[in-house]
Amino acid sequence: METRIELKQGWKILQDVHDTGEKTGLYAAREADTSVGSQVSEWEELEELKHLQLIYARQPYFGRELRYFNQAPWWYKTEFEVPDQKVTDAVLKFTNVDYYGKVWINGEFLGEHEGYSAPFSFNVKDKLVFGEKNYLIVKVSSPWDDEVELDAQDSRTTLVKRNMVKGTYEHSDTFIQRDVNPVGIYGKVELILTEEGVLEDQTDLKYELDPDVRKADVYVETEARGLKSGETYDFNVKIREKESGLIKAEKTVQIMAEKAETGFKCELKVEDVRLWSTWDHGYPWMYQAELTLSRGKDILSSRTTNFAFRDIQIERNEKITRFWLNNRKLYIRGTSYFPDCYISAMT
């Protein structure tokens, strides 16, 4: 069984204008910073987790004043209590931190991460204080890139040396805004507590279509943690048509756990598959893989992942490069479109 505690409310924030927070110990487990002379701002209440420009800027899409959001790092703090319970595993998970992030819990450094749309997590079972207050501190920054290739300042837009994998041009994912460089925590921050047995969020699903693309062999692989060594667990996989809910295949694999973290694999055969296609060539048929981990009659954990069957080929020679989707020619149109330069404004 697992319990998810979403750390959504109660966040506080400050901007570390001199970038001295690590030296002065802003990550320490304490209720308030009472130091004098550091010129560090007071903690302010943060109403929600999203890009900071969307919260604090009067006009978040243009203007020189936006540059101050990236001149110095930001520190986030929240406090939470964890029920006094017996757990086999505890994971702290972030879905989005834009862009560089360092994380501390109860004054202890957990690690760091870079990348704004890649979830990351830490095992914190031995770091939590059960039944008492816990302190989570995160340092976040998305600095400007200053160096330009060959010092060609008149071509800065295309020749700036990129230290971050973000933005089609300099820092923006849409139009070319000189002063927009999104920064902040958004999405979900959650603590996942496991009493016994939990499936990882990430599922590795692959398939092979037969020559007439009417049947498919589906291969599902995932990891489970928090298992009890020597116990027997059932790993069940159902493949459904997403639109109708019809079960197309089902299989259960039984395994005896040798350690707390164990991998599960399952192979299924699906008949009469419906192929995903673009709107102008057919219909985007979707499927769902439902994964369930149980011990005896007790369901411990479940996950669902969406996927589609399709056959993609590429034809390439000296004269042409051509794509085929489900045995039909496909013309690849534009990509990399974002309706907003702040991803947190789209969710």
Task: Identify the role of each PLM range.
Residues 69-72, 80-106, 136-138, 233-236:
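Aromatic-lined ligand-binding clefts that engage carbohydrates, nucleic acids, or primary amines
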Residues 290-347:
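N-terminal carbohydrate-binding accessory modules
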Residues 7, 17, 46-52, 62-65, ...:
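An acidic-aromatic loop/edge-strand motif
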Residues 135-138, 283-295:
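Short, aromatic- and glycine-rich surface loops/edge beta-strands on solvent-exposed regions
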Residues 105-155, 256-278, 343, 347:
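Beta-strand-rich ligand-recognition modules
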Residues 107, 189, 287, 327:
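Conserved, mostly hydrophobic/aromatic
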Residues 1-93, 165-187, 194-195, 317:
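Extended carbohydrate-recognition surfaces in non-catalytic/accessory domains of CAZymes
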Residues 105, 215-255:
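Beta-strand-rich binding/interaction modules
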